[in-house]
Amino acid sequence: MKHLTNWGGILGLALIGISLVLYLLGMTEASWVQWVNYAVIAAIIYVGTQAKRTSQDGVLSYGQGLSAGVGIAFFGSVLVAFYTFVFFSFIDPDMLQDLILRMEDEMYNSGMPDAQVEMTMDMSKKFMQPGPMSAMVVLSYTFLGFIIS
């Protein structure tokens, strides 16, 4: 368990660091950012799983490797979820409103009917709040850890 929390902590801090640097540079809109995050997640899960295998005299079953990768992703995602909650609640709450407005503009510009845009936005606004977003971070990063492992 300590192994998972250590590597999960490294993963979480790495993702938070990337997010903060991009925020300070004003590059949060860049589309390539998600690919950098995926690469970091994959690399840290790989290195963490290899370290676990090494600590077990070079023997690691498929199930142990899978649980190590998912565990690392889960513990990392908990840190990122906490950061997400703090960021959108206290650091830059206006950014969330900007995202919602941009999403609405994109829907109107794509030719979506007004009624459908309104219905979609009503649903989106319920989930685009710090709490639900943080929960989605945990779910999505843990699932991604499962896929990568």
For each feature predicted by the language model, list its residue ranges:
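Transmembrane alpha-helical insertion/packing segments
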Residues: M1-K52
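Alpha-helical transmembrane segments of multi-pass membrane proteins
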Residues: K2, N6-I10, S67-G76
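Polytopic transmembrane helical bundles with strong interfacial aromatic enrichment
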Residues: T5-G9, F88, V137-Y141
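Alpha-helical transmembrane segments of multipass membrane proteins
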Residues: A14-L22, I44, G76-V80, T84, ...
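Membrane-helix interface/capping segments
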Residues: A51-G65, S89
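Hydrophobic alpha-helical membrane-insertion segments
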Residues: I72-D94
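Membrane-interface interhelical loops and short interface/amphipathic helices
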Residues: I91-Q129
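Individual transmembrane alpha-helix segments
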Residues: M123-F146
